[in-house]
From Swiss-Prot:
Keywords: Autophagy, Cell membrane, Endosome, Glycoprotein, Golgi apparatus, Lysosome, Membrane, Signal, Transmembrane, Transmembrane helix
Subunit description: Interacts with ATG16L1 (via WD repeats).
Glycoprotein found in the keyword field: yes
Gene it is expressed from: TMEM59
UniProt PTM comment: N-glycosylated.
Organism: Bos taurus (Bovine)
Glycosylation sites: 90
Membrane topology, from the record: Single-pass type I membrane protein
Name by which UniProt lists this protein: Transmembrane protein 59
Taxonomic lineage: Eukaryota, Metazoa, Chordata, Craniata, Vertebrata
Length: 323
């Protein structure tokens, strides 16, 4: 069963402050084993313990209670820092001093415990700075370097794809097309042969032999370079050619889009606004003259009062009208 995190649950269940409970656990059990077990989690307090030993040496303070109280203050500060996740060290120090006040009733032991809390504070700040320095930080130029690496990878892959194979199309006399495809073959200049190991040869013969081989290698290299100079230049500069082609393609596409938008017919037809003064505005636009009020003739008719419809015709029985 997992124990809930937080000091409120411990106070409610046990009625003992959690920091005091942890300090009692560290002091009551095997001191060395428990300290080694918690050092990896709570941090190293050896420097604080040495400071306490220098402050309370046994030859000056025969009683060991004050020394133990100071060392326990170091441990209490580490526990408080672990509980608070090291957010505010000043608050951690206040909690450590409060735990010392609850743990000890003697003023000397309380002072020694408070001194242990104070001694552990600079070491905790140093450890926190070291942890912050270990955190990875992103440089401002990291996006640019990422884009550059992506672009270089894309260019290299395209270059390797282009130079992966050579394809030749030949048309025979009967009209058939023959396709030759093969991987590019790299020709290296022939290496100079090793000098003869015969000790009887003179140095002059060695020099003439080397000059002859070097001139032959240079001549072969020039002949090969003249034969496939264009293809070699294309393969070496394919990266720049591909880059320029892509940039020009993007520029052409942008120009086409802008030209299309500029010359396109407007598809949006603005809706006409309705107004209660539409007739008046129409007359003003057409410059029509209004009729004066005196030229209007109003004709009124008198309605007859109490005018009723005539009586209905009498009903005739058709059976009595037979002849």
């Amino acid at each position: 069963m997992a124990v809930p995190k937080g000091s409120l649950w411990l106070r409610a269940q046990l009625g003992i402050p959690p920091l005091l409970l942890l300090a009692m656990a560290l002091a009551g059990g095997s001191g060395t084993a428990s300290a080694e077990a918690f050092d990896s989690v709570l941090g190293d307090t050896a420097s604080c313990h040495r400071a306490c030993q220098l402050t309370y040496p046994l030859h000056t303070y025969p009683k060991e209670e004050e020394l133990y109280a100071c060392q326990r203050g170091c441990r209490l500060f580490s526990i408080c820092q672990f509980v608070d996740d090291g957010i505010d060290l000043n608050r951690t120090k206040l909690e450590c001093e409060s735990a010392c006040t609850e743990a000890y009733s003697q003023s000397d032991e309380q002072y020694a415990c408070h001194l242990g809390c104070q001694n552990q504070l600079p070491y905790a700040e140093l450890r926190q700075e070291q942890l912050m320095s270990l955190m990875p930080k992103m440089h401002l130029l990291f996006p640019l370097t990422l884009v550059r690496s992506f672009w270089s990878d894309m260019v290299d892959s395209a270059q390797s794809f282009i130079t992966s194979s050579w394809t030749f199309y030949l048309q025979a006399d009967d009209g058939k097309i023959v396709i030759f495809q093969s991987k590019p073959e790299i020709q290296y200049a022939p290496q100079l042969e090793q000098e003869p190991t015969n000790l009887k040869d003179s140095s002059l013969s060695k020099m003439s032999y080397l000059q002859m081989r070097s001139s032959q290698a240079h001549r072969n290299y020039l002949e090969d370079g003249e034969s496939d100079g264009f293809l070699r230049c294309l393969s070496l500069n394919s990266g720049w050619i591909l880059t320029v082609t892509l940039v020009l393609s993007v520029m052409v596409l942008l120009w086409i889009c802008c030209a299309t938008v500029a010359t396109a017919v407007e598809q949006y037809v603005p809706s006409e606004k309705l107004s209660i003064y539409g007739d008046l505005e129409f007359m003003n636009e057409q410059k029509l003259n209004r009729y004066p009020a005196s030229s209007l003739v109003v004709v009124r008719s008198k309605a007859e009062d109490h005018e009723e419809a005539g009586p209905l015709p009498a009903k005739v029985n058709l059976a009595h009208s037979e002849i």
